[in-house]
Amino acid sequence: MVLSQMDAGKALTAAAARGNTSMVQRILEESRVHPDTPNEFSMTALQVMMMGNSKIASLLLEKGADPNVQDKHGIAPVHDAARTGFLDTLQVLVEYGASVNIPDKNGALPIHIAIREGHRDVVEFLAPRSNLKHTNISGQTAIDVARALCVPDMIDLLFAHIHS
């Protein structure tokens, strides 16, 4: 498979978006494309990958993908993993250096998003690693988001981490 860098970038992002692990691996190995090569929409494979496929995340990160790459809205893969609730993918991203304290353009950290989406296991993972005093553009901390959404179990979980 001989592809130009641009074509290889398109093929890589398409395979990652479809969750095609074997094709992602093949493109990375045979075309020697850098995993951060963007597609025609300026998105990398890590940004468009099927979040439920932690194996693809591992392949891309092992080959040097930037775990903190952000789109024009400040959304990083950790925000997407927190939003969709894929803890295994989030763990891989963090293992490879993704920051859990990277804000999007609204100032939301991944923990704010996980609380909003109701992903308790993700919140449990993020709480000891996150800056729980960080406020979004509305001035809300993670606990404030949980209070606004009336989720007492998340409020308790966050208080436990603050007072530990």
Protein language model annotation of sequence segments:
Residues M1-A11, P128-S164:
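Ankyrin-repeat-protein effector appendages
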Residues M1-E30, E40-M43, S164:
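Intrinsically disordered, low-complexity regulatory segments in ankyrin-centric signaling systems
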Residues A14-N20, V48-N53, D80-F86, I113-H119, ...:
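Ankyrin repeat A-helix N-terminal signature
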Residues N20-L28, N53-E62, F86-V94, H119-A127, ...:
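Ankyrin repeat structural motif
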Residues P67, D71-Q91, E95-Y96:
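Eukaryotic tandem repeat interaction scaffolds
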